[in-house]
Amino acid sequence: LIRVLANLLILQLSYAQKSSELVIGGDECNINEHRFLAALYDVWSGDFLCGGTLIHPEWVLTAAHCDRYRLSIKLGMHNKNVQFDDEQSRYPKKKYFFRCR
């Protein structure tokens, strides 16, 4: 019985890895459809960290785990692999943390 379950688990995992679509049945959004979306990058490595929301011309709201010593915030991105003319990059001057209790 354990061998059968192990084989079923391996079969299921190997099938799941073959899927090439990230979102099943999804469509690519239009350019500037989500213009309040911000992408946060680590300045030193250039790695994508997480997303945020532009809630004011000078404020981006993110989750607490997005904190790094030096961040780059990119706005106006449609595809992170393609650079567009209206993309903007900013560096935060201050960071604020609010604890929910």
From Swiss-Prot:
InterPro entries cross-referenced by the UniProt entry: Peptidase_S1_PA, Peptidase_S1_PA_chymotrypsin, Serine_Proteases_S1, Trypsin_dom, TRYPSIN_HIS
Chief subcellular location: secreted
Cellular compartments per GO CC: extracellular region
Disulfide partners: C50-C66
Source organism, top-level taxon: Eukaryota
Prodomain positions: 17-22
GO terms for MF: serine-type peptidase activity; toxin activity
The protein's name in its UniProt record: Thrombin-like enzyme okinaxobin-1
